[in-house]
Each structure stands twice: as structure tokens, then as C-alpha cells.
Design a protein with these regions (language model features):
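Conserved, well-folded catalytic cores of nucleic-acid-processing
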Residues: 18-22, 44-47, 68, 102-105, ...
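Short helix-terminus and kink motifs of transmembrane alpha helices
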Residues: 26-27, 77, 97, 148-156, ...
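Mature, Sec-exported extracytoplasmic domains of Gram-positive
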Residues: 4-5, 49-50, 64, 106, ...
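Transmembrane alpha-helical segments that form the functional core of multipass membrane systems
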Residues: 13-118, 128-135
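Hydrophobic alpha-helical transmembrane segments of membrane transport and translocation systems
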Residues: 10, 193, 199-282
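Generic detector of multi-pass transmembrane helix bundles and their immediately adjacent loops
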Residues: 85-219, 223, 227-228
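Cytoplasmic juxtamembrane regions at transmembrane-helix boundaries
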Residues: 28, 151-167, 250-265
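Single conserved hydrophobic/aromatic residue that forms the stacking wall/gate
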Residues: 1-11
Length: 282
């Protein structure tokens, strides 16, 4: 079993490297870096009592910086994508906390809460924030995809049509982002529903009424995750578009040569004298 699973992982990496080339190798490297940050940075700090939400945002920033740097290098496009991604994730985190307080979801209404309470007795981990940390990590992939796509689109437009100004590039980025909002929102919703599918099936089997179902902690948590993640994706679009339009869309004014520049800066240029009906130079 373990040998077959290991071979499967090797084949997956080979396929990514063959199809993606250098980009595929860099994607695997960034994924490995994110895993190392989660296991060796986020988890130990959580056990020492550091806020899970705060340390998760730090890990998200580090992962975003390395991933987008490997894929796009140090450029205005990368800076725009990083700003848009981090802003979207922060918005998703803030929205999750606000929605959680409004709906009375404290973070203790999660699976394995009994085990977590036992672990918390011997550690300083703040288990009430783990739910919101999971929302932040789940929203990272979608916001990063949107931020990089918007920045790449604006850069391509600027290279193809340098005459476009900041406003035109921003509007074009917003138009492209509108098409991505719906698909990315569906991606987040489907991911959350897929992760809690067994629990949803159990609730359906008990034939609960609509009021009981919609007011349950499970459904409330799913709605909170979907709304906060979607809000983060939606706000990533204008932020990334605005930053990219400002950084990438700066026009370089080319000075047109004047007549005096053509004639070595002489202001007393005179037409050559001619004589005769055929205009021969004297």
C-alpha cells in the first residue's frame, strides 16, 4: 500500500514537471515550502499559544511571496498579484470573524472538538480560532489564482497596447475579474461542501426541517466559510486590478524631435539660394 502510494506521488510529480516544465518544478517547490511552513512554523507556534489567525496570515504571506516570486520573478506583475492576494485573504479572515460573531459561531463547533479540548489541556493552543484559520488557508488558493490572473492580464494588455492608460487597464482588469468571480466562488463552495458531505448526508437522513437545518452549526459554518471566502475573492479583483494598473500602466512620454534638434540645434537655418529657372543652387 505504502509503496504504491509513493509511486503514485512520484508519477504525479513527473507529470507536473513534464507538462509544466520549469514552471511545474517551481510549483512543486512552492507547494513543498508551504507544507514546511505549516508543519514546522504554524503548528509549533500554535502550540505555544500564538494566535492561530495571526500565524496563519503570516504563513499565507510567506507562501504567497515565494510562490508568485517563483512563477513571475521580481516584477510589477508579481507585486500587484501579491498585494491583491494578501488583501483578499485578510478580507476573508475579517469577514469570517465578523460573520462568526454575528451567527454565534465561536469556533468550538467543529469536528474532533473533544480531542482538541484534551490537547488544549496540555498545551496553550487556542482551539476557538482554528476554524477561522482553516477558512484563511482555504481561501488562499482562489485569491492567489485571481490576483495573478488579473495582474498577468493587465501586463499583457499593456505590452500589446502601450497607449492604454491607467483607467483603461483598470476597467479591463475588472471586466476580466467579473468572469472569474463566479467560477472561483463556486470552487470555494464546492470545496467546503465536499469536505462536509458526510455530515450533510447525516443531517438529511434525520429529515430535519428547514428551520432546524439552516440554524444548525454545521450549515452555519458552511455558509460562513462560503461567504467569507467569496468576499475575499471578489475584493481581490479590484485591489489587484488597481495596483497593477497603477504600476504597469505608467506611460513613458517620448519627446518628439523638433526642427532645431534636426539641424543640430541651429535657430538661424536658411533655405539654400537658387538661381535660374531650374532652381540650381548657387
Amino acid at each position: 500500500y505504502y509503496a504504491s502510494r509513493g509511486l503514485g506521488d512520484v508519477y504525479k510529480r513527473q507529470v507536473i514537471c513534464i507538462i509544466g516544465g520549469k514552471k511545474g518544478v517551481k510549483a512543486i517547490a512552492s507547494l513543498a515550502f508551504t507544507g514546511v511552513c505549516i508543519v514546522y512554523l504554524m503548528f509549533p507556534l500554535m502550540y505555544r499559544g500564538i494566535s492561530p489567525i495571526g500565524i496563519t496570515i503570516v504563513v499565507v504571506i510567506l507562501s504567497t511571496l515565494l510562490t508568485l516570486w517563483l512563477l513571475g520573478g521580481v516584477s510589477k506583475k508579481t507585486v500587484s498579484a501579491v498585494v491583491g492576494t494578501v488583501s483578499g485573504v485578510v478580507v476573508a479572515a475579517a469577514a469570517a470573524v465578523v460573520f462568526g460573531k454575528a451567527a454565534g459561531i465561536t469556533g468550538y463547533n467543529v469536528s474532533d472538538i473533544e480531542t482538541l479540548n484534551y490537547v488544549a489541556q496540555n498545551t496553550q493552543i487556542k482551539i476557538g480560532q482554528l476554524l477561522f484559520s482553516g477558512i484563511i488557508i482555504a481561501a488562499l488558493g482562489a485569491t492567489m489564482d485571481v490576483g495573478m490572473s488579473i495582474a498577468s492580464t493587465i501586463q499583457e494588455l499593456h505590452e500589446r497596447s502601450p497607449q492604454l492608460g491607467t483607467k483603461e487597464l483598470f476597467v479591463s482588469g475588472i471586466r476580466v475579474g467579473r468572469d472569474m468571480m463566479g467560477t472561483m466562488a463556486n470552487t470555494l463552495i464546492f470545496a467546503y461542501v465536499g469536505g462536509s458531505l458526510s455530515t450533510l448526508v447525516v443531517n438529511y437522513a434525520y429529515n430535519l426541517s428547514y428551520n432546524q437545518l439552516i440554524n444548525s452549526y454545521v450549515i452555519g459554518t458552511e455558509i460562513m466559510q462560503g461567504l467569507s471566502g467569496t468576499l475575499g475573492v471578489v475584493l481581490t479583483v479590484p485591489i489587484a486590478a488597481a495596483v497593477a494598473a497603477v504600476l504597469i500602466g505608467k506611460k513613458k512620454i517620448v519627446k518628439e524631435p523638433l526642427m532645431q534638434d534636426i539641424y543640430d540645434g541651429s535657430d538661424d537655418y536658411e533655405e539654400p539660394e537658387t538661381d535660374g529657372e531650374y532652381g540650381e543652387d548657387v
